[in-house]
């Protein structure tokens, strides 16, 4: 049971169900939509492709970069595809800017090749910033790249597991549910319940 001065006492499960739904919003008008999708693919050659797609559009006409964009017309429509091996090393990268507000935007595509040979995992965001940070890259492509690693982890079997059975999966200790001292780890990975890294 969880109790509050507003709701009285309710079962914990009920609180979880309540937290999963947003309340009915106030009367409002839509202004902007950003759609981001990630998809993982197993290739026949034993490698994996992870694709990311970002699309921005507004619900009213607006002008930027000397061009007027109509409602629903994407002014950002960008794709990134990386090919990785089992060790999550990037073997190839491809970028497409199907829509962009300024003619200079595609100039950031060639430097993306600098990520070939990098590994998804610890330090990935630092690697992105080293190669594509600031004026060397694109804010929106960096956003896709930052999260493409998560899609890879979800897509590739064993990506989050250390081959050493005496070490916990890499996602343990990264969020509330996977707290080493919490009930989920105690149930699912009792071996690593209360685990502390050795220094």
Positions of the model-derived regions?
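N-terminal intrinsically disordered, cationic/polar leader segments
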Residues: 24-49, 53-64, 77
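Short N-terminal helix-initiation segments at or just after the protein's N-terminus
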Residues: 18-32, 156-163
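Intrinsically disordered, low-complexity segments enriched in small/polar residues
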Residues: 3-6, 38, 171, 180
């Amino acid at each position: 049971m969880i109790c509050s001065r507003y709701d009285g006492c309710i079962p914990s499960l009920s609180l979880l169900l309540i937290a999963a739904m947003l309340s009915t919003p106030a009367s409002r008008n839509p202004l902007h939509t950003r759609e981001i999708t990630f998809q993982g693919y197993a290739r026949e050659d034993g490698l994996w492709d992870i694709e990311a797609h970002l699309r921005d559009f507004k619900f009213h006409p607006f002008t930027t970069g000397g061009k007027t964009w109509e409602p629903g017309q994407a002014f950002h429509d960008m794709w990134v595809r990386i090919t990785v091996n089992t060790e999550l090393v990037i073997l190839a990268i491809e970028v497409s800017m199907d829509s962009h507000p300024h003619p200079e935007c595609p100039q950031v595509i060639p430097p993306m090749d600098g990520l070939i040979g990098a590994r998804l995992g610890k330090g990935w965001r630092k690697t992105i910033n080293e190669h594509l940070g600031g004026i060397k890259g694109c804010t929106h492509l960096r956003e896709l790249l930052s999260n493409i690693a998560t899609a890879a982890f979800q897509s590739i079997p064993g990506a989050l597991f250390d081959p050493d059975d005496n070490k916990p999966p890499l996602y343990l200790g990264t969020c509330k549910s996977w707290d080493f001292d919490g009930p989920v780890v105690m149930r699912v990975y009792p071996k690593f319940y209360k685990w502390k890294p050795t220094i």
